[in-house]
Amino acid sequence: MSSIVGRGGESGPGAPLMARGLLAGVTVLSLEQATTLPFLTYRLACDGARVIRVENAERPDPNRFVGHDVLGEPAMRSYFLPNNCGKEAITLNLGHPDGQALLRALIVKLGVDVFACNQRTRSYARLGIEPQRLLAVKSDLIWLGITGFGPDHDEAAYDPVLQARAGFMELTGDAGGPPTVFGLPMVDLGAAEHGYSEVVKALYRRATTGEGARIDVSMLRSAVSWMVAPIALSSSLGERVARKGNRHQFFAPVAVHRTRDGHVYLAVGNDQQWAALTALPRFAGLGRPEYAANAGRIADVDGLDRALADCFADLGTGEALESLRRAGVPVSRVSTLADVVADPLVAERLMHVADPRSGLRIALPAPPVGEPPALSFPPRLGEHNEKIYGEALGLGPERLAELRRRLIV
């Protein structure tokens, strides 16, 4: 049985600093842009993989130019930075036959384990990245492509378009209000997580069979796969599923309430928790027989929420949290992002990535499981050309200069 790591072995000297993780020794070559694939490969980097971004020097990842200018470098703006820590970067013009030849040579010489892309499918042949072509170069390669709607559909897609298409917006926002997108690009992030799991499964399968794989991730299918309950309830079981704002369709009280100095979210999930809430002096007036069971609370949810609003209005947030938590009632402060970063359960596991040139430090949340890895600062455009082309292909400065003049790298 072969190892899960690639035949390329350990990451070479000078590779981004990272804690040795499960995927140490796995090399990923990623033709990536925007959010979903960069987040997927960021997750792989967090687990120890060597991730090398591939970009066209003349038309790099558009996200490099999005956000605030925090470094005085036009191709290193703020929105690009978070999802690209822990990576290396090269430039390569895959629209030129010589660029395609270099890609194939890199796959062989670096012992690339995973090639990933999130281009539209109509570009595959033009760029020379079709799965059959690259698997012919290295038969145990894992080829991953992320598209909006699958490899047989070339429609352009971005996260909010897919939130609309997948029905997310129908379920998000105030009841009676307009459809609303999430505050996070959940379709991008969800497709990245699904792609990540498929890569890890393919690496395991290859370790047992020696075979490569083609993985096609449809962002639409990824998003709809989360809609298990809404689709089953609405299409098969006769339920009307629609926007509820901060409420829950089946449980009450579940809502946001204003306090004297902020907001709290109260989520009572069963009758025992309701009894615990109404045992508190502040809420004792709500301990009426008609509210004892969840069905009764749902039947008068408007009146119930108005009464709870009165109970919370002159309570301080800290006082509300302390009393309800002590009673075993699920409740949380509605946190600002500053609150989240300061939360002791978060703060002790933040990762900090520093730019060796400017000293700028970026705080990142740690992966959900395991120790926070140490990651390098996001790479400049083509930052590792000399190292990687020299390491893998023996190309010296003069040859690289010639390739730059010809717009190949």
Describe the residue ranges of each PLM region.
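N-terminal helix-loop segment corresponding to the beta1-alpha1 unit
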Residues: M1-T208, R380, E386-V409
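Aromatic-enriched alpha-helical interface/lid elements that frame and gate functional surfaces
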Residues: A252-A327, V331, F377
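Conserved Rossmann-fold dehydrogenase catalytic segment
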Residues: P151-D152, G177-L184, A207-A223, A242-Q249, ...
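Short, well-structured beta-strand/strand-turn elements
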Residues: V51-V54, R325-D339, L395-L400
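Glycine-rich beta-alpha junction loops
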Residues: E58, G148-G150, M219-V224, D261-H263, ...
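Mid-domain beta-loop-alpha active-site segment that forms a flexible
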Residues: P185-V200, M219-M227, G269, Q273
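A glycine-rich dinucleotide-binding beta-alpha-beta segment and adjacent secondary-structure elements
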Residues: G318, R326-L375
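Oxidoreductase and adenylate-handling cofactor-binding alpha/beta cores
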Residues: A192-G212, A229-S236, T278-L286
